[in-house]
């Protein structure tokens, strides 16, 4: 009787264990297939007009060092930066699995399938998380709640991405938004093109930081219907050791605001 009970128990136990192992393998296999399907997509080619004028542009791949498995990379970013420049304007991404911010300390991981927005500062290749200042988030036909802006994450595909030295672009067809980034040594230049049928908007997150870092003492002044200025103190992997770093900005829009709203805390 006891022997039969043990045999029955073992059958049930190993049956449950087998089902659990199978479920885990199916989950891992499904996620791996989804991951490979996303990262293996071919990106846009650099226009002939650019390669004709700047032949060496075709020899540079800004996406090198932005991906890796498992979630390890060279902490590079695909955005805009000039030699010895202060500006490092680039997209930020969120995880395919959890929707958390990219584990890449520069803010962009090639295996992430969501775009959070476009920020202006970061470190490169250090493995230290510092920067992510003044995140810009384009929106279209999105209703915002009365007290705090909803977290904005756009699904995207690498087939709609293009980057070469000094330029980055991304199309978000589902939202009817086209993003273009370029810059100078100390300024980032954004161009957002919206479909005529969309209700366009821009969110500026002054308190944003890369990763799980924090910020405080945000300040914003609206000068007129096209100009803003402000500052923030952020505490990253380096700056947090020395009381944080205070970063200032001035922003100018080429189109006057139809209306604006400010959120705090």
Residues covered by each model-derived region:
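Long, compositionally biased intrinsically disordered regions
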Residues: 1, 34, 210-212
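N-terminal type II signal-anchor transmembrane helix
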Residues: 4-40
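Accessory carbohydrate-recognition regions in carbohydrate-active enzymes
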Residues: 38-265
